């Protein structure tokens, strides 16, 4: 088990807030000394069902504000994010279990490769408006990150083992009272645990772990004028 303090980052690639939080955590891994970050794929659809939550995109007023909020947040962190025009149609038709199982296969082999593939899925969906739901989509993602046997990885992901791991991860998230993604569980050095939702709690996590407050690259290192 990774040493403490530790951040367990539960994510699903359908979630744009997971994308934003992922990119921020990738920067913080080099800035927050002594903090371990574990990236844990789970299935957001099951989390929403178990918690009784509904996707923001399915609530008209909330979906409008969500898109505005996403653009603001992505701009602040310098993350290229454009909601795909067919997003509503896609989330009604497809699930992300296939994508998440592919990531689990990669995670078994090479954590860094899994992280590159997860980023490619987010960029594909949230920057290029391309699907990430079917076998051919997965093959294209894997080729983009340099996997030499993409078809074999996709086929391996269909083994029952990986849906079991995915649901175990999902159930752990539900046990932590997760109701959306990303779900962030912080383990402090004294052994206590603290849960956070979303991509706008980094200042609280930094304070909890007594780490530097996170800033986008253009502001990192600047001193306050106050």
Swiss-Prot record:
Coiled coil: none annotated. Keywords: Transferase. The keyword Transferase applies. One of its GO terms (cellular component) is peroxisome. GO terms for biological process: glutathione metabolic process; innate immune response. It holds the Pfam family DSBA. It catalyses: RX + glutathione = an S-substituted glutathione + a halide anion + H(+). InterPro entries: DSBA-like_thioredoxin_dom, GST_Kappa/NadH, GSTK, HCCAis_GSTk, Thioredoxin-like_sf. It is an enzyme of class 2 (transferase). Gene3D superfamilies: Glutaredoxin. Glutathione binds at residues 15-17, 53, 199-200. Its EC number is 2.5.1.18. One of its GO terms (molecular function) is glutathione transferase activity. PANTHER family: GLUTATHIONE S-TRANSFERASE KAPPA (PTHR42943), GLUTATHIONE S-TRANSFERASE KAPPA 1 (PTHR42943:SF3). Belongs to the GST superfamily. Kappa family. This is Glutathione S-transferase kappa 1. It comes from Caenorhabditis elegans. The gene is gstk-1.
């Amino acid at each position: 088990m990774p040493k403490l303090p530790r951040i367990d980052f539960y994510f699903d690639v359908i979630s744009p807030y997971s994308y934003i939080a992922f990119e921020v955590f990738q920067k913080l891994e080099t800035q927050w000394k002594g903090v371990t970050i574990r990236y844990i794929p789970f299935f957001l659809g099951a989390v929403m069902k178990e918690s009784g939550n509904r996707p923001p995109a399915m609530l008209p007023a909330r979906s409008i504000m969500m898109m505005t909020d996403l653009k603001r947040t992505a701009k602040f962190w310098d993350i290229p994010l454009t909601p795909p025009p067919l997003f509503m149609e896609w989330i009604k038709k497809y699930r992300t279990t296939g994508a998440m199982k592919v990531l689990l296969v990669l995670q078994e082999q090479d954590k860094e490769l899994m992280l590159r593939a997860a980023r490619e899925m987010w960029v594909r969906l949230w920057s290029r408006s391309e699907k990430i739901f079917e076998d051919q989509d997965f093959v294209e993602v894997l080729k983009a990150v340099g996997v030499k046997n993409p078809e074999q990885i996709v086929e391996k992901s269909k083994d029952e083992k990986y849906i079991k791991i995915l649901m175990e991860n999902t159930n752990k998230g539900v046990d932590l009272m997760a109701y959306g993604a990303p779900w962030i569980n912080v383990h402090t050095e004294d052994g206590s645990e603290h849960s956070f939702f979303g991509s706008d709690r980094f200042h609280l996590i930094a304070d909890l772990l007594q780490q530097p407050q996170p800033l986008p690259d253009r502001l990192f290192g600047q001193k306050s004028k106050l």
